[in-house]
Swiss-Prot record:
Matching Gene3D superfamilies: alpha/beta hydrolase (3.40.50.1820)
Classification via InterPro entries: AB_hydrolase_fold, Hydrolase_4
Protein name, as recorded: Uncharacterized protein YfhR
Matches recorded under Pfam families: Hydrolase_4 (PF12146)
SUPFAM superfamilies listed in its UniProt record: alpha/beta-Hydrolases
């Protein structure tokens, strides 16, 4: 027997509420697990850093640092490395992981995504893609940088953003791509945190969709086998989907984004430098 109209209405409203919750709120809760921004100052600015304010394509104001080579003029550096950091803190927290590069005659450009550090806005998948593309373009147009000698270096979620950029055709001047502790799929990581939530995320931003398009740009993937944040199998999968030239380094005792920390000394730093030099000067 059918329910009276006055009894069906609350039930229908409840069903609509549940549907709205699943469609609108759950995806936002899931994606928020990827972002842990703050504006805390983790250490002094690099002594030689130039503070750079720039605007994303959608008008969001962003903050970056340009740190020139410490061994000579910036326009004489081996290359300029554009660093896309992980999903927590801000660029001041990640500076120690790249602070060694200017001493090896590399310029470094770091930047904070929207909502991180002094950058305005709220993090989102589309927003971080916009921010990363905009940062690369800022570097391309600097008068003290060779725009044909750019290296993209992404750690954790930064690697996913870099793959998005490459996959959408932004390749001019990029001579090497380095991904450290990067995940292959947003959905897979989300499911680890909230089972089933991955189905509600936009997988069009996942790196596994674009990794094959990096070629013929040389690609280096590096991942610690003791990484409890992003399992190393993500890099293994990305490597399997990538085309040559490519290289995968797995660190037996490596933790999340610590390959270039002081814990490992110069072991992986030198391998990264050798990779970049090889990419810039390929053997025919």
């Amino acid at each position: 027997m059918a329910l009276p109209v006055n009894k069906r209405v609350p039930k229908i409203l409840f069903i609509l509420f549940v549907v709205a919750f699943c469609v609108y709120l759950v995806p936002r809760v899931a994606i928020n697990f990827f972002y842990y921004p703050d504006d805390k100052i983790y250490g002094p600015d690099p002594w030689s850093a130039e503070s750079v304010e720039f605007t994303a394509k959608d008008g969001t104001r962003l903050q970056g640092w340009f740190i020139p080579s410490s061994t000579g003029p910036a326009d004489n550096a081996i290359a300029t490395i554009i660093h896309a950091h992980g999903n927590a803190g801000n660029m001041s927290a990640h500076w120690p992981l790249v602070s060694w590069l200017p001493e090896r005659n590399f310029n470094v450009f770091m930047f904070d995504y929207r909502g991180f550090g002094k950058s305005k806005g709220t993090p989102s998948q589309a927003g971080l893609l916009d921010d990363t593309q905009s940062a690369i373009n800022v570097v391309r147009h600097r008068s003290d940088v060779n725009p044909q000698r750019l290296v993209l270096f992404g750690q954790s979620i930064g690697g996913a953003n870099i793959l998005d950029v490459i996959g959408r055709g932004d390749r001019e001047g990029i001579r090497a791509v380095i991904l450290d502790s990067t995940f292959a799929s947003y959905a897979t990581i989300a499911n680890q945190m909230i089972p089933g939530s991955g189905y509600l995320l936009d997988e069009s931003y996942s790196g596994e969709n674009y990794i094959a398009s990096v070629s013929p740009i040389p690609l280096l993937l590096i991942h610690g086998k003791a990484d409890h944040v992003i399992p190393w199998q993500h890099s293994e999968k990305l490597y399997s989907l990538a085309k040559e030239p490519k290289r995968l380094i797995l660190i037996p005792d490596g933790e999340h984004i610590d390959a270039f920390s002081d814990r490992h000394g110069d072991v992986y730093r030198e391998q990264m430098v050798d990779f970049i030099l090889s990419a810039l000067n390929p053997q025919n």
